[in-house]
Amino acid sequence: MLQTALGTRGMVTAPHALAAQAGLDILRQGGNAIEAMVAAASTIAVVYPHMNSIGGDGFWVILPPNGSPLAISACGGAAAAATIDAYHKRGMKRIPMRGPWAANTVAGTVGGW
């Protein structure tokens, strides 16, 4: 059976109780929703790592209560040698999906936090 939770001062939901508690603790200390989300996400990375980790990227769209929307792109960069010219010099028309010239990026999640 579904259970409905209602609140008037904020709430946090997460797939692990410790993550939800971390977010709730931030709200109780006067933090905002973004700070609570970071607390919950970083906790999930430890207690539930197969669901969320610091090894990815983050793309956020945030709408402040009295402001304009803003975006955060927490995407890590590729290696400095992964340039268009470098691929063309090696006769490549596309970036390979695998192998030493696949342009994997460095994780950007923590930078977004």
Task: Go through the PLM ranges and name each one.
Residues 1-21, 25, 33-112:
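Noncatalytic scaffold domains of N-terminal-nucleophile
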